[in-house]
Amino acid sequence: MYQEYPPCQLLAPYIDKYWEFKGETEYDMRYKILPDGCTDFIFSIEEPSQPLNGEMLMQPYRFYFVGPMRVYSELVTRSIRLHMMGVRFSPCGLAAFARMPLGEFTDTRVNASELNVLFDDHFAEMLCEKESLQERIHIIDRHLIARLPGLQPVDPQIIRATDLIVQANGMLPIQQLTDKLYIGQRHFERKFKHITGYTPKEFSRITKFRYATRVLRQMKGEDMQQLAIDCGYYDPSHFIKEFRKLSGSPPSAFMALPIPEDDPLTYIE
């Protein structure tokens, strides 16, 4: 049902992946989506679906923007079939294409036609009319590559900061991070949030959580105490509390759920 596709080489610095969610489902089925430090444009190709809080119904042939999410969200199907495609931008990727203050879109989903950024309704309709995912990816590639010559460079310190945080699995103290970058912490935090939508601490927290989900999926009876320490948490209770807050489930329930091997960030409850 869920598949991921890498971007072309020219767009790899900006796009984390393309993804497609397609298949038969059940009415009112819940899909939990975990925070990943990225932002998405989602094209709804067939039947409607709706976030659990009911803030909007995602209609076919429309597109939506999902801002930087700090905790899990839930999507509820409103049909027996689900088909959508997403363009997932890397933490600093969207800032190169659109000078929008991502800090104002944290934990939000909006009808993307209201933003007037990158895509429009005509583009979304044309994309959804195509028969195959490969055609859709080709159209998006061509659309974004045409904009590469006009891109404004993203602050290299912030790009470097996100790279360092990811390399450290979210366990690099912010003071050490700013020391490595030779930048004042307050100024750094403002720039980081403007470009990524997160504070450095929030982004580190999500990166650590993502690392913990990968480790947890590979566990086979290992000691939870050691797991918590290896993933940068004080103790098992701290780990369980953080995991529950970001995923909506304790680690034990997460391990028991049917999670697709290629998608640790989306699962059915």
Regions found by a protein language model. Give the residues of each.
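Alpha-helical bundle regulatory/interaction domains
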Residues: 1-169, 173-175, 180-185, 199, ...
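Catalytic-pocket segment enriched in acidic/His residues
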Residues: 186, 190, 198, 202-218, ...
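Extended amphipathic alpha-helical scaffolding segments in membrane-proximal extra-membrane regions
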Residues: 173, 191-192
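Contiguous, well-ordered alpha-helical segments that form the cores/surfaces of helical PPI scaffolds
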Residues: 163, 210-214, 241
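A secondary-structure capping/hinge motif
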Residues: 195-198, 242-253
